[in-house]
Design a protein with these regions (language model features):
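Active-site-proximal substrate-binding groove within the catalytic cores of carbohydrate-active enzymes
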Residues: 1-182, 198, 205
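C-terminal beta-strand-rich structural cap/linker in extracellular carbohydrate-active enzymes
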Residues: 184-212
């Protein structure tokens, strides 16, 4: 098909994502990576997050599904994020939705850079353990952390060790949710880590960082 139609785009939408294999990925784009989508159900949100979180190691470009009802919190919205995302924005509370979409577009620019999973045990225990992953543009030094405390996690505070930083550079980190800013060296963020507090279950944070 591609040989006869140069530039043809083929959507890999078979078996709920079970055909995301190397040969198919050479020839197609996964516009629907799984039949799990963010619908407002707690399990669906965390499952969709885990799929994107782990799949991004091997397949950075993919898209998942969501419903308007399912994206009503920052936690659920961020569970649905990927390099592609479906969003049906309601008229009500347009300002909140606009902020979420603006934040997403900023994160998406970083998704083609380097990707690191900074938390452990999130393949099988993704509903009970905090999650943190990092995107960073190695050329500009700009990046972000996306953090989740799922319903079943008892950990209000956790330290994460950033990767891909210049140890001699100083970084400004800004929490997207409340505007809080700190500065720290790349060496300190990598060696000593960044301690983050999430004081309630089903809480999520996005932290952007850049070299000063």
């Amino acid at each position: 098909l591609i040989g006869q139609n140069p530039g043809l785009l083929i959507d890999n939408c078979a078996s709920g994502g079970r055909r995301l294999d190397i040969e198919m990925m050479k020839r197609s784009v996964p516009l629907w990576r799984s039949d799990y989508y963010v619908s407002g159900n707690v399990t669906d949100s965390d499952s969709a997050r885990s799929i994107g979180y782990n799949l991004s190691y091997w397949l950075p470009l993919s898209c998942g599904g969501s419903t308007t009802d399912g994206l009503g919190t920052s936690y659920d919205f961020r569970c649905a994020m990927g390099s592609g995302m479906t969003v049906d924005i309601p008229v009500s509370d347009f300002g909140w939705w606009s902020r979420r979409v603006d934040e997403y577009f900023r994160i998406r620019e970083l998704m083609s850079g380097d990707y690191y999973i900074l938390s452990q045990g999130n393949v099988t225990n993704y509903t009970k353990k905090n999650a943190c992953y990092e995107y960073i543009d190695p050329e500009s030094g700009e990046g972000c952390l996306i953090l989740f405390r799922p319903e079943g996690s008892l950990a209000e505070k956790q330290t994460f060790y950033l990767k891909g930083l210049d140890p001699d550079a100083v970084y400004t980190l800004r929490v997207s949710d409340n505007g809080e800013e700190i500065t720290a060296s790349g060496k300190a963020l990598s060696d000593d880590g960044l301690t983050v507090s999430m004081n309630q279950p089903r809480m999520s944070l996005v932290i952007f960082f850049s070299e000063k």
